[in-house]
A protein has these predicted regions:
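General secondary-structure edge motif
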Residues: 15-16, 28, 35, 56-59, ...
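Hydrophobic alpha-helical transmembrane segments of integral membrane proteins
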Residues: 15-32, 81, 85-96
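Membrane-interface helix-boundary signature
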Residues: 12-19, 67-73
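Membrane interface segments of multi-pass transport proteins and intramembrane proteases
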Residues: 9, 101-106
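Membrane-helix boundary elements
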Residues: 1-16
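General structural signal for secondary-structure boundaries
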Residues: 13-17, 43, 103
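Pore domain of cation channels
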Residues: 46, 53-103
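Outer-pore turret/helix-boundary of cation channels
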Residues: 19-50, 65-68
């Protein structure tokens, strides 16, 4: 139980340090999604939904851009989503590694 709390404590500590970067990435994804929505004439919710489905690389395919500029922006949104996911995974690994070393589990 102490191990789990140590991992969570370290995870949220690192998240708090990287919050400006994570917030910037999320706002950039949302903003680019709204831009694509404007180009494609989608409503705001549909554009937001599509941008995060694309950024998280889920890609249901129920909504897709048809214009060339929208497709280009969707590539950028996808890359930003991969960066965001990579940062979260790196933070999780760092927190777990710290907890393993601190508790002496091997």
């Amino acid at each position: 139980m102490a191990f789990t709390f140590l991992v969570l404590h370290q995870f949220f500590y690192i998240i708090s340090l990287t919050m400006p970067l994570l917030t910037f990435l999320l706002l950039l994804i949302a903003g680019l999604g709204q831009w694509v929505g404007h180009i494609e004439k989608w409503d705001k919710f549909t554009a937001l939904y599509w941008s995060f489905i694309t950024a998280l690389t889920i890609g249901y395919g129920d909504i897709r851009p048809y214009k060339k500029s929208s497709r280009t922006l969707s590539l950028i949104i996808g890359m930003l989503g991969i960066m965001f996911t990579g940062i979260i995974v790196a933070i999780t690994i760092a927190a777990t590694t710290h907890a393993i070393k601190a508790t002496g589990i091997e």
